[in-house]
């Protein structure tokens, strides 16, 4: 990679020599080029994200005020928590109108707090606004990840957020516990990418304590731990997750441990066929057949094994780039300080600075390979550096390497969703916010990517599910997985070619 490019990515706009400040602002921002930048350039997502959050605030308020609330599980949640608050710690005795309590202890504590805040669960409108806050907070965390990765154009996220009726319904009209678990999960992902490991492990374990579907991310997290921390520190983080589960479950484990484990972590629970979104075309007998369940579990494990090597390679590349960032960032900071301190240094000082601050050949080749691989993986073209232009400041957007971390996490979750024994409508939040990222991680055309997202939205909005909607959902999952797999193979080839090129350059230097 050539010396770092200027950090600014906004389109250049000619400025008038004279005029008021207002004229200057209008000339700079109220033009077609700037609007195209906001819609198409991933680097503009932090700006666009603010408008998305403000618009979503209005949308959620309108939905709460105008669309009737639908009671499904809220009353049952309150009944289950009321039993706990009355002193019952036997999970087999904690029940609601829809059946026994089947969620871990963190769910009980969170919804017990909501029980008190909402006047024993009677103030549903207040609960709806609390869940609107959960929605906005989670969306902010999701947008932060997308902003770091710079992979998906802003207009895709805008359309995805504004057009999903089902997602808004799940959050503010149904009050399910799935949004709470997913919120904690995205908080954990943000913390992991900030390298705040113990806090991230804490939030991940809390998410599992709300609902077990978060364990679908666990295979990727285990490899991420190992790649970043090594074996001993990985064991420490796993211990953090385990201790939190023990602390959360202590009131139940110390009194009725078997009932707690059987009730909250029941992997063999049979789902009702009438609520399935993905297997409507199967008969009830096949749907509830144990052999069918074991077959899906086997397929899940086989897919995880098939993706294990590229996932591990992605994580290793991510770790190497973070180490390069740690090496180069002090140099970049020093160069920016020098540029700020003096506009035109003397020639002697220039030569001295070049000798001291010049990136090593290994660093340059590694960064060049990284930039090339990410550009090809995202389908983008290299941005030519302006010839003989003196940058205002140096900068390398190292956070773009989060692409190497996010895709494996989202992919593992998608595999789990695709192989699920049954999907209910509220389960859409498990992977909804990762779908644009996954679609843009395929080599498909823009039209095919949008078609995939549109079909998935159609399937989840079809109520009750039909044979066609269930089959279409499986079809889109398969197409999406196949596209991601193809892109992974291409990226692996690019990575291997970059390694060979780097090795050849090192041999020449020797």
From Swiss-Prot:
Going by the entry's taxonomy, the superkingdom of the source organism is recorded as Eukaryota
Name a single GO biological process.
protein glycosylation
Q: Which residues lie on this side of the membrane: Cytoplasmic?
A: 1-43, 119-125, 193-211, 255-294, 425-426, 486-510
State what changing residue 311 to T does. In strain: Berkeley, bIf and Apxo
- Outcome when changing residue 433 to R: In tid4 mutant
Gene knockout outcome: Pupal lethal. Pupation is delayed by up to 11 days resulting in giant 3rd instar larvae. Imaginal disc cell proliferation is slowed resulting in smaller imaginal discs with aberrant architecture compared to wild type larvae of the same age, however, during delayed pupation imaginal disc cells continue to proliferate unchecked resulting in imaginal disc tumors. RNAi-mediated knockdown in gut progenitor cells results in increased intestinal stem cell mitotic proliferation.
Task: Please name the InterPro entries in this protein's record.
Answer: Glycosyltransferase_ALG3
Indicate, by first and last residue, each region the UniProt record lists as having compositional bias (Basic and acidic residues): 348-358
Task: Give yes or no: UniProt keyword Electron transport.
Answer: no
Membrane topology, from the record: Multi-pass membrane protein
Print the keywords alphabetically: Developmental protein, Endoplasmic reticulum, Glycosyltransferase, Membrane, Transferase, Transmembrane, Transmembrane helix, Tumor suppressor
Topology, Lumenal side: 65-97, 147-171, 233, 316-403, 448-464
| Pfam entry (one) | ALG3
Alphabetical GO CC annotations of the entry are:
endoplasmic reticulum; endoplasmic reticulum membrane
From the UniProt record, list the reaction(s) this protein catalyses. an alpha-D-Man-(1->2)-alpha-D-Man-(1->2)-alpha-D-Man-(1->3)-[alpha-D-Man-(1->6)]-beta-D-Man-(1->4)-beta-D-GlcNAc-(1->4)-alpha-D-GlcNAc-diphospho-di-trans,poly-cis-dolichol + a di-trans,poly-cis-dolichyl beta-D-mannosyl phosphate = an alpha-D-Man-(1->2)-alpha-D-Man-(1->2)-alpha-D-Man-(1->3)-[alpha-D-Man-(1->3)-alpha-D-Man-(1->6)]-beta-D-Man-(1->4)-beta-D-GlcNAc-(1->4)-alpha-D-GlcNAc-diphospho-di-trans,poly-cis-dolichol + a di-trans,poly-cis-dolichyl phosphate + H(+)
User: In UniProt terms, what function does this protein have?
Assistant: Probable alpha-1,3-mannosyltransferase involved in the N-glycosylation pathway. Involved in glycosylation of the TNF receptor grnd, regulating its ligand affinity. Required for normal epithelial growth and architecture. Suppressor of JNK-dependent intestinal stem cell proliferation.
Q: What else is known?
A: In strains Harvich and Apxo, there are 2 genes which code for l(2)not/Alg3 protein. They differ in their C-terminus.
How is this protein named in the record? Dolichyl-P-Man:Man5GlcNAc2-PP-dolichol alpha-1,3-mannosyltransferase Alg3
Lineage, highest ranks first: Eukaryota, Metazoa, Ecdysozoa, Arthropoda, Hexapoda
Gene symbol of the encoding locus: Alg3
